[in-house]
Regions:
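Catalytic active-site module of serine/aspartate enzymes centered on a nucleophile-bearing elbow/loop
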Residues: 205-241
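N-terminal cap/lid segment of alpha/beta-hydrolase-fold proteins
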Residues: 1-13
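Conserved alpha/beta-hydrolase "nucleophile elbow" surrounding the catalytic nucleophile
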Residues: 32, 95-100
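Active-site loop/oxyanion-hole signature of alpha/beta-hydrolase fold enzymes
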Residues: 39-46, 54-94, 227
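The alpha/beta-hydrolase serine catalytic core
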Residues: 127, 132-174
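Conserved serine/cysteine hydrolase catalytic core
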Residues: 158-201, 206-209, 217-218, 222
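Conserved HGGG/HGGXW glycine-rich cap/lid loop of the alpha/beta-hydrolase fold
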Residues: 12-64
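Flexible "cap/lid" loop of the alpha/beta hydrolase fold
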Residues: 101-109, 115-143
Length: 241
């Protein structure tokens, strides 16, 4: 059974969910989306097949809500604080939606510690939302519960306000990491043009579309993405699943 653990980043208490067990030489560190909390994934953690942790950056779930530190580089350092709490060695990074930007931000500063990367329905960029979109998102629901119950409202607004448009495409391509990318059938957050760019810049990547999934690629099958990640990280380790 997964357990809640905490670590510290510059005085900010960060929560993460930890499956425990054998990390097989490199645990999975999963950085989910803006409206996710770690508990969303408790049921599927065993299916990853090795020790897996789910990060809650500041302002999310059970993590602290400081007055500042909501810029991209600081949120990336939250990811790094959890990584360091779990291991001093390499990890397999898994991301979903907006968590992708913060995970990649950390990876680009610590490339020798990243054994593979799997991205769920996003592109390697920090993106800006159009005016009005953040509040509409935060006033809505995600996976059946109000978003305001998942993320601190003021912290989320600060996160969107501190965001800066940043591209990681070229830097990430230079790392030549084993890469898995899954996009949803909505083709909104990963357009056909961006999908083609993935093919050009990452010719060895595994690119898969879940044509029956909305942006929440854990629907309708909660374990489909997890199984792909499991096979991906095992292959990156040079061992069978």
């Amino acid at each position: 059974m997964a357990v809640s653990r905490f670590t510290d980043n510059g005085g900010v208490r960060l929560h993460f969910l930890d499956s425990g067990g054998d990390d097989r030489g490199a645990p999975i560190v999963f950085v989910p989306g803006m409206t996710c909390v770690a508990e969303d994934y408790a049921e599927v953690l065993p299916a990853f097949g090795r020790r897996t942790v789910v990060v809650e950056i500041r302002g999310h779930g059970r993590s602290g809500v400081p007055a500042d530190g909501y810029d991209g580089p600081t949120l990336s350092s939250d990811v790094g604080a959890v990584v360091d709490a779990v291991t001093s060695g390499p990890v397999h990074l898994v991301t979903f939606s907006r968590g992708t930007a913060y995970a990649i931000g950390w990876a680009l500063r610590h490339p020798t510690r990243v054994r593979s990367l799997a991205i769920g329905d996003y592109i390697p960029e920090e993106r800006l939302l159009p005016p009005g979109a953040p509040r509409r998102l935060l006033d809505g629901r995600w996976r059946g519960t109000p978003v305001r119950d998942r993320v601190d409202y003021d912290a989320a607004i600060k996160t969107f306000e501190r965001a800066r448009a940043r591209s990681f495409w070229n830097e990430l391509a230079r790392l030549r990491l084993p890469l898995l990318v899954v996009r949803s059938g909505e083709r909104v957050l990963v357009t056909d043009e961006q999908w083609s760019r993935y093919r050009r810049e990452f010719p060895d990547a595994t690119l898969i579309e879940f044509s029956d999934s909305p942006h929440d690629i854990f629907r309708p099958d909660r374990r489909r993405f997890v199984q792909l990640v499991r096979d991906h990280v095992d292959h990156a380790d040079g061992r069978p699943s």
